[in-house]
A protein has these predicted regions:
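Bacterial N-terminal signal peptides
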Residues: 6-13
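Cell-wall glycan-active module
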Residues: 1, 14-483
C-alpha cells in the first residue's frame, strides 16, 4: 500500500518536475542568446522540445543566424508559427535585413503578411515603391520629415530625394530643426542642420551652447543678429529654451527683440510661452496664448490652452481652443464634455445637451459627468462573469499558454507582449475570460488591463482588483491606524 501511495505521489509530481526542468533549460537558452553562444543555444533547443516555450528558443537561434539563414528555413518557421507574436517579430526583423540588402523581390513577398510595420520597415516599403516609379511614395514619406524624432536610416534616402526634388525647401528644414530642438533631440537636430544651404547651418557647438545657457546667448548676441536667418532662428531657440525654465524671464527677453521678427515667428514664441505658463498654472498663460493668434499648436499645447481657460473660467476660449484641436482629439469624451460645458455657460443649452448625449452612458468618468448633467442616474452596467468553459477555451490558446509560461519564469516583458498580441481581435466575452485567467494566475496587471479593454460587457470588480483585501481586513484596527 505504501509503495502504491509513493508511486501515485511520484506520478502526480512528474509533470511539475518536467515543467520546472524545461523552464530551467529555457532560461539557460536565454542566457546563451544573450552571450551569442549558438552552440549552447542549439543544444538547449533539443532539450526543450515539447515545452510551451520551444518556439522562443527556436526564434532566438534563428535571430542569431538571421544574416545567413536561408529563406526556406525562415519561411518554414513562419509557416508553423503563422499568426503568432514570434512570427510577426521574426518577419519584421527579416524584412529589415532584406530592405538593407535591397532584396526587393523577397521583401515584396514578406511585407504584406506583416501586421504592424514600424517606421524603419515602412520606409523600406516606400523605398521599394519609389524604385518602381510610384511617386506617391514620396507624398506618403513627406510627413515623416516633420515628426520631432530621429529617423531610421531607411528613411534618409526618401528625405534626401524629397530635398533633391524641391518637395522640401529651406523653410521646411528650419521647421524640422525647430521641432527637434523643442523636443530636445540634439543629435537629429544637428543632422538636420547639415541640409541647410552653405553658411546658414548653425554649428553643433552653437546649438549645445544655447541649449545649456540660453540667457547667455541672448545677452551676447550681436546687435545685427536678425540680419540672417540663422541669427533669428538661434534667438528663437534661446527664448524657447529659456521659457522651459522661466517663462516670465523668457517673455521679458522676447519683448526686447520681438520687433525684429515676423508675425509668424511671434506667434510661435507666444505659443511656447502660453504652453509653459499653462503647465505652471501662471495667470499670464491665456494672454500669451491670445498673442499667438493663429499660430499652429501641437496637441499638447492646445490641450493646455483649454486647461488654462478652464482654470480662468473663460468659457469662450474653452470652446475656441477645442475647435482648434484635430478632429480625432475633439472626438474624445473629455473634450466633448468640456465643449458641452462651454456651450452651457454661454447660454447655448441645446448644443450643450446634444454633446452630453453623445457620451452619456459611456463607462468612463466623462460619460458619468454627462449623465449627471442630463439628470440621469449613474448606474453600473450588469456585471458580466465568464463561464468556466470560456476560461478553459482561452487557457488553451497557444499564445496564452506561452504568455503564462513566460510570466512563470519571470520574463515579464516578453510575457506582456505575447499576452497583448494574443488578445487582438477578442470580443468582450473572451477578454473577460482572459482577465479571469490572469487573475487566477495572480498576474494582476494583465487582469486589470484586459478587463479594461471591454466595450459592452464589463466586470468592474476585475478592473479595480484588491487582491490583498482579506489580509488587510485581518489586521487589528490599531495597526491599520498606525499605517
Amino acid at each position: 500500500m505504501k509503495r502504491l501511495l509513493c508511486a501515485l505521489v511520484l506520478a502526480s509530481s512528474l509533470p511539475a518536475l518536467h515543467a520546472a526542468n524545461g523552464d530551467e533549460r529555457v532560461l539557460a537558452a536565454k542566457d546563451a542568446v544573450q552571450r551569442g553562444d549558438r552552440a549552447k543555444l542549439a543544444k538547449q533547443l533539443e532539450a526543450v522540445r515539447g515545452h510551451e516555450l520551444e518556439p522562443y528558443v527556436e526564434y532566438w537561434l534563428l535571430r542569431l543566424r538571421l544574416e545567413e539563414a536561408g529563406a526556406a528555413e525562415l519561411r518554414e518557421f513562419l509557416g508553423r508559427q503563422a499568426g503568432s507574436y514570434l512570427a510577426e517579430k521574426l518577419r519584421g526583423e527579416w524584412l529589415k535585413v532584406l530592405g538593407k540588402r535591397r532584396e526587393w523581390d523577397a521583401f515584396d513577398a514578406e511585407y504584406p503578411p506583416l501586421v504592424q510595420a514600424d517606421q524603419e520597415i515602412t520606409c523600406y516599403a516606400l523605398q521599394n515603391r519609389l524604385r518602381l516609379a510610384d511617386l506617391g511614395a514620396l507624398d506618403e514619406a513627406r510627413p515623416l520629415w516633420f515628426t520631432p524624432a530621429d529617423l531610421p536610416e531607411s528613411c534618409i534616402p526618401l528625405m534626401e530625394q524629397l530635398l533633391a526634388d524641391k518637395r522640401l525647401g529651406t523653410d521646411d528644414i528650419w521647421e524640422r530643426l525647430r521641432r527637434l530642438l523643442e523636443a530636445k533631440k540634439p543629435g537629429a537636430a544637428k543632422a538636420t542642420a547639415a541640409y541647410l544651404p552653405v553658411g546658414q547651418a548653425p554649428s553643433a557647438k552653437t546649438l549645445d551652447a544655447i541649449a545649456d545657457k540660453p540667457l547667455r546667448h541672448l545677452a551676447l548676441q550681436p546687435s545685427n543678429f536678425a540680419s540672417s536667418r540663422q541669427g533669428r532662428e538661434m534667438a528663437l531657440f534661446a527664448v524657447q529654451r529659456l521659457a522651459r525654465t522661466d517663462p516670465a524671464q523668457a517673455a521679458q527677453q522676447w519683448e526686447g527683440i520681438r520687433d525684429k521678427f515676423s508675425a509668424a515667428d511671434g506667434g510661435y514664441i507666444y505659443a511656447q510661452l502660453g504652453w509653459q505658463a499653462a503647465l505652471r498654472h501662471l495667470p499670464e498663460a491665456l494672454a500669451w496664448y491670445a498673442k499667438a493668434g493663429n499660430a499652429p499648436l501641437s496637441d499638447e499645447q492646445v490641450a493646455w490652452k483649454v486647461r488654462a481657460a478652464l482654470r480662468a473660467q473663460n468659457w469662450a476660449v474653452v470652446g475656441e481652443a477645442i475647435g482648434q484641436m484635430p478632429k480625432a482629439m475633439q472626438a474624445q469624451p473629455d473634450w466633448i464634455y468640456w465643449l458641452g460645458r462651454a456651450h452651457e455657460a454661454l447660454g447655448r443649452q441645446e448644443e450643450a445637451r446634444a454633446l452630453y448625449q453623445r457620451i452619456a452612458g459611456q463607462p468612463n468618468f466623462y460619460g458619468n459627468l454627462a449623465d449627471d448633467e442630463l439628470g440621469r442616474p449613474i448606474q453600473l452596467p450588469p456585471m458580466a462573469k465568464p463561464a468556466s468553459e470560456e476560461v478553459k477555451a482561452v487557457a488553451a490558446l497557444p499564445g496564452i499558454r506561452r504568455a503564462l509560461a513566460l510570466f512563470r519564469i519571470d520574463m515579464r516583458i516578453e510575457g506582456i507582449r505575447e499576452w497583448n498580441w494574443t488578445l487582438r481581435g477578442m470580443d468582450d466575452a473572451k477578454l473577460l475570460a482572459a482577465a479571469e485567467l490572469a487573475h487566477r494566475h495572480e498576474i494582476f496587471d494583465r487582469a486589470i488591463n484586459t478587463a479594461d479593454r471591454t466595450l459592452a460587457l464589463h466586470d468592474y470588480s476585475m478592473r479595480y482588483l484588491a487582491p490583498f483585501r482579506e489580509l488587510k481586513a485581518m489586521q487589528p484596527d490599531a495597526l491599520i491606524m498606525a499605517d
